[in-house]
């Protein structure tokens, strides 16, 4: 396989096992570089395997049905892989204070569903960076953390 195909296989496994319907935290040790950067607009940046595992553990405790899935084929060029996705979940778990725009009290029952595009950089077979551009405004509005846009 080419470098790009190898990198797409790594990212495909990451999306399925880390962001999919169930989370296998062991995939962090298998695929993430020791100092991997995970950065999305809704949350503070995470650095390193332990920080990334702690983030996902808290996210899935607050949103037990959390899952994301690919919305298009992965695109690869050199060390980079780009994926378009959608997903979300229902806040039925404990209070969640990881959003940059506020805290959810325990079990609000609010649902979020949103989309995004993620760029991942692969270095020597490990994910060095995952930087996502997401529709965080939609998610925060659905969760009641910011006002919904007025409709005409």
Regions found by a protein language model. Give the residues of each.
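C-terminal and inter-domain tail/linker signature
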Residues: 1-152
């Amino acid at each position: 396989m080419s470098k790009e195909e190898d990198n797409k296989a790594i990212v495909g496994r990451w999306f399925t096992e880390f962001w999919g319907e169930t989370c296998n935290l062991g995939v962090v040790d298998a695929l993430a570089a020791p100092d991997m950067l995970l950065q999305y607009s809704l949350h503070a940046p995470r650095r390193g395997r332990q920080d990334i595992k702690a983030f996902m553990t808290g996210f899935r405790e607050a949103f037990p049905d959390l899952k994301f899935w690919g919305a298009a084929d992965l695109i690869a060029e050199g060390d980079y892989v780009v994926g378009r996705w959608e997903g979300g979940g229902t806040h039925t778990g404990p209070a969640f204070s990881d959003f940059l725009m506020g805290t959810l009290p325990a079990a609000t029952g609010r649902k979020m569903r949103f989309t995004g595009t993620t760029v991942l950089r692969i270095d020597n077979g490990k994910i060095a960076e995952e930087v996502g551009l997401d529709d965080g405004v939609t998610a925060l509005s659905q969760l009641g953390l910011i006002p919904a846009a007025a409709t005409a």
